[in-house]
């Protein structure tokens, strides 16, 4: 796997304009929708239990994000996820804050037990807590802890029968057999809320058009990281507000050529 190979997935997303069904959190809904539109995908935010199964059945991908967790949304996620499974729609799960509270951890473990996942995406602490491995966590954005990230990712992929994506200073993608590290991105991403949540939805757009989910995830992460680097180069001295606007611009303007030129991936 190389940057030339994965760069083609970006063009495919823009040509296909996939419908990405998001059941996400209230903090990031607008940013997620705008980010997907900028990329070239079609976002829909449908949460009502009366319609989620139908909406999920016609989507290119379904993204479940438990950032602002409520029982009615959990019910909707389960309905949507099972419909997606029945209709061969890939499901992505972002277990935001898993480990922060007992209820949040319970839900983070229940959803993968009930729904077949194409991708699980989180920081190291979240993924570790989903598979009941000890890792430090403080709040929903924590990811710093003691442990081997690659080992946790492989364990999650094996136990959950999915592609595990752990993001941080370096990103890891694995299906338990193939493992790739991506070294793109910028630290200013941590100063804008919702960049991780948007990333999961962007991976959803890539998964909708590329059925090799490892390749799709690596392509999405590399694209996202390169876009962040290009945006930061223009705005980092101004601050996160300017960066957020330019980042949306770069999600629209970053090309497959940029990925070939700036992408940093390593198969391990």
Curated annotation (Swiss-Prot):
Q: In which pathway does it act?
A: Cofactor biosynthesis; thiamine diphosphate biosynthesis; 4-methyl-5-(2-phosphoethyl)-thiazole from 5-(2-hydroxyethyl)-4-methylthiazole: step 1/1
Kindly report, in one word, the top-level EC class recorded for this enzyme. transferase
GO BP annotation list: thiamine biosynthetic process; thiamine diphosphate biosynthetic process
Q: Which cofactor does it need?
A: Mg(2+)
**Which residues bind ATP per the record?**
121, 167
**Enzyme Commission code:** 2.7.1.50
Q: Which reaction(s) are listed as its catalytic activity?
A: 5-(2-hydroxyethyl)-4-methylthiazole + ATP = 4-methyl-5-(2-phosphooxyethyl)-thiazole + ADP + H(+)
The entry lists its GO molecular-function terms as:
ATP binding; hydroxyethylthiazole kinase activity; magnesium ion binding
NCBIfam families, sorted: PRK09355.1, thiM
Homology family: Belongs to the Thz kinase family.
Q: What does this protein do?
A: Catalyzes the phosphorylation of the hydroxyl group of 4-methyl-5-beta-hydroxyethylthiazole (THZ).
Annotated protein name in UniProt? Hydroxyethylthiazole kinase
Q: Which organism is this protein's natural source? A: Bacillus thuringiensis subsp. konkukian (strain 97-27)
